Curated annotation (Swiss-Prot):
Subcellular location: Secreted, Extracellular space
InterPro entries named among the record's database cross-references: Serpin_CS (IPR023795), Serpin_dom (IPR023796), Serpin_fam (IPR000215), Serpin_sf (IPR036186), Serpin_sf_1 (IPR042178), Serpin_sf_2 (IPR042185)
Record bears the keyword Magnesium: no
Name under which the protein is recorded: Glia-derived nexin
Example of a GO biological process term: negative regulation of plasminogen activation
Superkingdom, natural source: Eukaryota
């Protein structure tokens, strides 16, 4: 006998275009840690590819799922995330508000939505809690027409990402008979550098990619004061890191790469956690230096199903075991896909250099160099909360 189970799809889309007021290991840092663990699982199978994810987006989707889960399904989510969303809803709401605050000066938007099959009966407490904690909107769509349903969802995504990401969800991922709902998270960030890279300084330079081949790529260059530092992994591999603040200074890009060119990026990434990144922020010192960084655009779409299963979140994907009775009691649901599409653009754009920076640019003494000419790790961090909005590796710009 063939059993047919209703299911739902989760999608999270993220976009980037160019100390903490919470406790020492905040809820948002715990959520970001989950995203970092997922990232580590992804790069195991894609060590030489460009990969970009949004830990905050992953935490948001899993948080919405946790609100609708019960039994062992909820326990697995809570164990991996290390907190119960219901118990800390007020704090999560405060964190989400801080991330999108206009005080950031840079543009940050986080949007969540649930797309329901026409006539689907969703439990009222789940809908109310989801709206309160994650500001999640609800829309009805006709999943029996997969092309129309995917078009509606993709239109929402395109609108929330300012037209930069479309075609997230293909019609063939929607089962007209069984799909009941699609959860979507979209994160958009556009930041201007605090200290702008001048276009005339951008020149082609050599970048040694993850495959060992050399490529000539456009490199941004700037002489300014940056906070930077170095440390080593538990097994003694040294690496360097540097902070590039955006003009609002509440958000920064952090870049890390091995000190020795013979050390692969994959050797240091497994040791990176939110606690590690916090330690960078606390130990970096300002230095006048020449920074050389690739100008790049990277886009990646990833199904997070297998990485999450590797971390121990398995039941929600199994039709006979998944428990989402807090979403609906009328039928059994399971998750068929968790998709994330992320895009990052790094260029010269930014605010004009300050007078102090201009003065530094013409100073005569010879500064140290920080040259990013081989595979590197980057993160976009919301400093007041410790939230990691974006995380990625670049093997070839």
């Amino acid at each position: 006998m063939n059993w047919h189970f209703p299911f739902f799809i989760l999608t999270t889309v993220t976009l980037y275009s160019v100390h903490s007021q919470f406790n020492s290991l905040s809820l948002e840092e715990l959520g970001s840690n989950t995203g970092i663990q997922v990232f580590n699982q992804i790069i195991k199978s894609r060590p030489h590819e460009n990969v970009v994810v949004s830990p905050h987006g992953i935490a948001s989707i899993l948080g919405m799922l946790q609100l609708g889960a019960d039994g062992k399904t909820k326990k697995q989510l809570s164990t991996v995330m290390r907190y119960n969303v219901n118990g800390v809803g007020k704090v999560l709401k405060k964190i989400n508000k801080a991330i999108v605050s206009k005080k950031n000066k840079d543009i940050v938007t986080v949007a969540n939505a649930v797309f329901l099959r026409n006539g689907f009966k969703m439990e009222v407490p789940f809908a109310v809690r989801n709206k309160d904690v994650f500001q999640c909107e609800v829309q009805n769509v006709n999943f029996q027409d997969p092309a129309s349903a995917s078009e509606s969802i993709n239109f929402w995504v395109k609108n929330e990402t300012r037209g930069m990401i479309d075609n997230l969800l293909s019609p063939n991922l929607i089962d007209g008979a069984l799909t009941r709902l699609v959860l979507v998270n979209a994160v958009y960030f556009k930041g201007l550098w605090k200290s702008r890279f001048q276009p005339e300084s951008t020149k082609k330079r050599t970048f040694v990619a993850g495959d060992g081949k050399s490529y000539q790529v456009p490199m941004l260059a700037q002489l300014s004061v940056f906070r930077s530092g170095s440390t080593r992994t538990p097994n003694g591999l040294w690496y360097n890191f540097i902070e590039l603040p955006y003009h609002g200074e509440s958000i920064s890009m952090l870049i890390a790469l091995p000190t020795e060119s013979s050390t692969p990026l994959s050797a240091i990434i497994p040791h990176i956690t939110t606690k590690t990144i916090d330690s960078w922020m606390n130990t970096m010192v300002p230095k006048r230096m020449q920074l050389v960084l690739p100008k790049f655009t990277a886009v990646a779409q990833t199904d997070l199903k297998e990485p999450l299963k590797a971390l121990g979140i398995t039941e929600m994907f199994e039709p006979s075991k998944a428990n989402f009775t807090k979403i609906t009691r009328s039928e059994s649901l399971h998750v068929s896909h968790i998709l994330q599409k992320a895009k990052i653009e790094v260029s010269e754009d930014g605010t004009k250099a300050s007078a102090a920076t201009t003065a530094i640019l013409i100073a005569r003494s010879s500064p140290p160099w920080f040259i990013v000419d081989r595979p590197f790790l980057f993160s976009i961090r919301h400093n007041p909360t410790g939230a990691i909005l974006f995380l990625g590796q670049v093997n070839k710009p």
